[in-house]
Amino acid sequence: MWKNTCKLLLFDLDGTLLQSDKTISKRTLSVLKQCREKGILIGVSTSRSEQNSLVYLNELMPDILISSGGALVKYGTEYIYKAEFSVTETNAMIDMARIVCGNDCEITIDTTDAHYWNYKVDPKKLDQSWGDSIYTDFSDFTECSLTLNLDIGP
């Protein structure tokens, strides 16, 4: 019955569309193309930022993108939903993270246009799929954020 009513297929990247080697199989791309030919929209929903998904988005060309854990929704090239923390809120969270977790806690922040990090080890050396990230110590961060993540590790 869903064949006649399905209008959108929505997929995660990591662990779903991406194989263990962080690639999308030719078979998957072929099936998604067939779905498109039947008028079904293809969407990606990921906790990754848009910037850290570009290598896959350029290959998939999704009609709909839900990124940064739902903080950003894009239909085609238009952002239709954006839930950002203000610069003041973002800096308050950075300050609180350092108070609670210590000054050397590892932080990543997603904005609409970039992915920022202060990791001791460049994440691109661990996983090439993370795309272009910008290193900062967050001491003078002046952007609204979509997400702020802490790696407090052992």
Language-model features, listed with the residues they occupy:
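Asp-based phosphoryl-transfer active-site loop
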Residues: 2-21, 93
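Acidic, His- and aromatic-enriched active-site or binding-groove loops in soluble protein domains
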Residues: 123-148
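Active-site phosphate-binding/coordination module
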Residues: 23-127
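Short hydrophobic/aromatic-rich motifs at helix boundaries and adjacent loops
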Residues: 2-5, 22-26, 65-68, 138-142
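Short, solvent-exposed beta-strand edge segments and adjacent coil->beta transition regions
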Residues: 77-80, 150-154
